[in-house]
């Protein structure tokens, strides 16, 4: 099965490509490399023995996408491409709507022309906004998002939903991720953010490896057990397996399919700091800072629907998430860049 993977050089996309190859699928990667490095292709080949086809370009470039579809017999699409930092989205909303919303619309148009009507969309738990009740189920209210990143994901969900209701031969799967962390257990691949990390785990890892002085913990006065934000952290390998489960089960069935991908358990920022200190064998210095705009107090998933319909469940523990992150960061202190 040939699958176009937009953003396939990024953190989640690259790990998913490895798992796809292991499952006998053939990923065709499209990425503009705005938040990724070419070295990822070599790492995928090192892990799988195969280097996937790669086309450098932007999903907002319709002629480019049309040419990729014409060159390959693609049966489905996994759409990861997009900007993903909550804080940056507050400062740069237009860039987020342009990349995430317009890019998705251009992709859908190109798919329709090519007769490819199966898409798995990389959505986010941010579409739920600040939830009144946790755990969050797939029918929890959406749309009251607290930042432009979340709004862009919600808008794309609405666009794809409208597309399905207009043309119900599409298979559209919306995967709402919670908080992806971890790395390939080999230490060969992991998260390599450009510039200052926006997400907790790579920031902790860079502090532990000596690239940064200390971790900034944003918000210590939330109504949570230790005052710091609580999130559902999911290992990127479990997340990758969730995409393959979606392609295999509902990817060939027309419909609008929506699933949470999380563990069903919440962990606080300070709990993750402690777990990482255990993994790397030394304390991680941090300071408590004011809340960030757009952040919420707590958020974790109800995972029963994915377990029931996809036969998928996250199995890796917080200890594995932190150990694999440290293994990646200690082996690759500068990420994919040479020292």
Where are these regions (language model features)?
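Hydrophobic, Gly/Ser/Ala-rich alpha-helical and linker tracts in large acyl-processing enzymes
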Residues: 184-197, 204-207, 213
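Oxidoreductase cofactor-interface core, primarily capturing Rossmann-like NAD(P)-dependent enzymes
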Residues: 175, 186, 215-217
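C-terminal substrate-binding subdomain of Rossmann-fold SDR/epimerase-dehydratase oxidoreductases
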Residues: 200-339
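Short, basic/glycine-rich phosphate-binding loops at helix/coil junctions
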Residues: 182-184, 221-222
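Pocket-edge positions in alpha/beta enzyme catalytic cores
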Residues: 57, 69, 96, 192-196, ...
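N-terminal Rossmann-like NAD(P)+-binding domain of SDR-like oxidoreductases, especially those catalyzing
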Residues: 1-183
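Short-chain dehydrogenase/reductase
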Residues: 97, 146-154, 190, 194-198, ...
